[in-house]
């Protein structure tokens, strides 16, 4: 899949060091050719909680059948 900046993506793996779970939504903020992405994850109020460099295979595009949910985010000390 070819992503571009500002695409909304779904995390397809667990990232416990960042308290990110499979299914969390993020926004592509930079594309590293050929297979890297910088993805920003924010709270529902818009506060950035994680900015992570990922491989293209670590995310998937949002599809029409995806349902959005809310969960608490554990902040690192």
What spans do the regions from the language model cover?
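Basic/aromatic-rich interaction segments and small domains that mediate binding to polyanionic partners
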Residues: 3-65, 70
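Short intrinsically disordered terminal tails
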Residues: 75-77
């Amino acid at each position: 899949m070819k992503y571009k900046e500002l695409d909304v993506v779904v995390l397809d793996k667990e990232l416990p060091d960042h308290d990110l779970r499979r299914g969390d939504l993020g926004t592509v903020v930079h594309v590293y050719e050929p297979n890297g992405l910088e993805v920003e994850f924010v709270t529902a109020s818009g506060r950035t909680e994680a900015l992570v460099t990922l491989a293209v295979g670590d995310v998937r595009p949002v599809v029409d059948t995806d349902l959005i949910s809310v969960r608490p985010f554990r902040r690192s000390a």
